[in-house]
């Protein structure tokens, strides 16, 4: 969105423009009453193709609704020379001359007033109000004119953590979480409203931790309160023995999830119906399709997930080849792909149909008997932050070891091929590039990598974190050093954190 208003807004600000804009917001954007919601559902269709979806926009100069995605509103703007339109989902004002969403103080004020009215009609409390400084705060600002500026070389947010005795597993996850963009924005905007005792609330401690990290202080922080709360709420992690960073991540997300409350004030006790910040950022939906080999009936279930655990070549689990070798041969269906293994290879294997065999027959609702079947996992809904766990630690009755297979992972990742909607592009388990691979909604950027050095019995965790777009740093407990992109991509990789490149705000 353009930071300042454009001159083309002035052409709209004539006669009763404020009242006209209010009517549009009341009837077609926020729709507070049941009557206006019915009117919106009936009236808001593209005047060219009749579609209800495709990011409908309304012309501000005349009565016209058009698709933004299919450029129908663009055609109208060009033909009629009507430069401004309003997004009917989010209320943003788009200028076709500037080719951007623009900001105008007067229009923004009207939008917020009408949104508050709509929330009140629906019995919803205001989610978040814009900060308006009090007289005392204005006085403080006048007496303290110096401001800290964020530049490309700024290191604010970088802070080491003291190792309290085999707590590198915790420190590496804390570094990844404190550099998760949306989580950082949530805590630095003081959005958490605690209804527990603050000294027992992990969310309160994380809020304080974010304040410590972004205070500008450079001395290493001592996370003793965080460690105490983790021990209190996740007893299996208590003690000074070495722990698994992945296990700590899941435990921390679980406790944070339980201590959070969603915007409607309901307890966050159901991962499928929760609006807490943890679920908003980290929860995705994993679709499991079980297909009967006799009648080909499909049974589908969707389960929430916070991370995706991926098998590696070299483990006792067969790692099927997913791309042909130099000679195109496969030995017993169990040979490894030629050359380096990639994260994409692991994801292809994860989403490949698996024959369950005669020893794992499932009762088919169509055949009404136990039949052999195939099972396939795909992504029904992607989280904002996707965490990939490379299963480097193998535990079995006969074997305990670390798998050191190098896995190549990219700076940018497109998850479109692994979506449930792209399932038809993989015929009989063979990977094909889907037609909609240019879908920006499924594209991710790498922002943190947790590594494990050493053996299963004795090791150490470190984290690479992205501070700015192309600036990487290595966090080794209290020591933070500059790192190159090559350092990051050449690392072994244990936990890989990716953030969506494009977000739609609600």
UniProtKB/Swiss-Prot annotation:
Recorded name of the encoding gene: usp22
Enzyme class, spelled out: hydrolase
Keyword flag Protein transport: no
Gene3D superfamilies: Cysteine proteinases, Zinc/RING finger domain, C3HC4 (zinc finger)
Cellular component terms per the entry's GO annotation: nucleus
GO molecular function: cysteine-type deubiquitinase activity; zinc ion binding
Listed InterPro entries: Papain-like_cys_pep_sf, Peptidase_C19_UCH, Ub_carboxyl-term_hydrolase, USP_CS, USP_dom, Znf_RING/FYVE/PHD, Znf_UBP
Pfam families: UCH, zf-UBP
Organism name: Danio rerio
Subunit organization: Component of some SAGA transcription coactivator-HAT complexes.
Cited CDD domains: Peptidase_C19D (cd02660)
Subcellular localization, as worded in the UniProt entry: Nucleus
UniProt: Zn(2+) 1 binding residues: 6, 8, 95, 98
Domain of life: Eukaryota
Described function: Histone deubiquitinating component of the transcription regulatory histone acetylation (HAT) complex SAGA. Catalyzes the deubiquitination of both histones H2A and H2B, thereby acting as a coactivator. Recruited to specific gene promoters by activators, where it is required for transcription.
Binding positions (Zn(2+) 3): 59, 62, 76, 82
SUPFAM superfamilies: Cysteine proteinases, RING/U-box
Domain USP, residue spans: 159-501
Keywords: Activator, Cell cycle, Chromatin regulator, Hydrolase, Metal-binding, Nucleus, Protease, Thiol protease, Transcription, Transcription regulation, Ubl conjugation pathway, Zinc, Zinc-finger
Keyword Magnesium: no
First and last residues of each zinc finger (UBP-type): 4-121
Protein name: Ubiquitin carboxyl-terminal hydrolase 22
């Amino acid at each position: 969105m353009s930071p300042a208003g454009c001159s083309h807004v002035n052409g709209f600000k004539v006669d009763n423009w404020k009242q006209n804009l209010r009517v549009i917001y009341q009837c077609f954007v926020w729709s507070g009453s049941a009557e206006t919601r019915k009117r919106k559902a009936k009236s808001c269709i593209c005047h060219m193709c009749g579609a209800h979806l495709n990011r409908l926009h309304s012309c501000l100069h005349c009565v016209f609704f058009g698709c933004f995605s299919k450029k129908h509103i663009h055609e109208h703007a060009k033909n009629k020379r009507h430069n401004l339109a309003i997004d009917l989902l989010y209320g943003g004002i788009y200028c076709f001359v500037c080719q951007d969403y623009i900001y105008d103080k007067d229009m923004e004020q009207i939008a917020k007033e009408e949104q508050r009215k709509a929330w009140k009609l629906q019995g919803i409390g205001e989610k978040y109000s814009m900060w308006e400084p009090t007289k005392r705060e204005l006085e403080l600002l006048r007496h303290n004119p110096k401001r800290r500026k964020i530049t490309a070389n700024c290191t604010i947010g970088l802070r080491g953590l003291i190792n309290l005795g085999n707590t590198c597993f915790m420190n590496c996850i804390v570094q990844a979480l404190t550099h998760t963009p949306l989580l950082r924005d949530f805590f630095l905007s003081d959005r958490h409203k605690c209804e527990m005792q603050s000294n027992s609330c992990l969310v309160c401690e994380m809020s304080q931790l974010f304040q410590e990290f972004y205070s500008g202080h450079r001395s290493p922080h001592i996370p003793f309160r965080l460690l105490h709360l983790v021990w209190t709420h996740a007893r299996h992690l208590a003690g000074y023995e070495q722990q698994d960073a992945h296990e700590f991540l899941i435990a921390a997300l679980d406790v944070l999830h339980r201590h959070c409350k969603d915007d409607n004030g309901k307890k966050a006790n159901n991962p499928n119906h929760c609006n807490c910040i943890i679920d908003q950022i980290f929860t995705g939906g994993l679709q499991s399709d079980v297909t009967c080999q006799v009648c080909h009936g499909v049974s589908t279930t969707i389960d929430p997930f916070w991370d995706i655990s991926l098998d590696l070549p070299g483990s006792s689990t067969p790692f099927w080849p997913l791309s042909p070798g130099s000679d195109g041969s496969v030995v017993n269906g169990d040979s490894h792909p030629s050359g380096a293994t990639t994260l994409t290879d692991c994801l292809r294997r994860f989403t490949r149909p698996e024959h369950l065999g005669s020893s794992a027959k499932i009762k088919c609702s169509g055949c009404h008997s136990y039949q052999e079947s195939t099972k396939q996992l795909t992504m029904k809904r992607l989280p904002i932050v996707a965490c990939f766990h490379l299963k480097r630690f193998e535990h079995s009755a006969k074997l305990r070891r670390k798998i050191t297979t190098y896995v190549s992972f990219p700076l940018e990742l497109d998850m479109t091929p692994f979506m449930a909607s792209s399932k038809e592009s993989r015929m009989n388990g063979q990977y094909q590039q889907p037609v909609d691979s240019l879908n920006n909604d499924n594209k991710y950027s790498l922002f943190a990598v947790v590594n494990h050095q050493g053996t299963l019995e004795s090791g150490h965790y470190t984290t690479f974190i992205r501070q700015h777009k192309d600036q990487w740093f290595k966090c080794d407990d209290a020591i933070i050093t500059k790192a190159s992109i090559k350092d990051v991509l050449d690392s072994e990789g244990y936990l890989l954190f990716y953030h969506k490149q494009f977000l739609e705000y609600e």
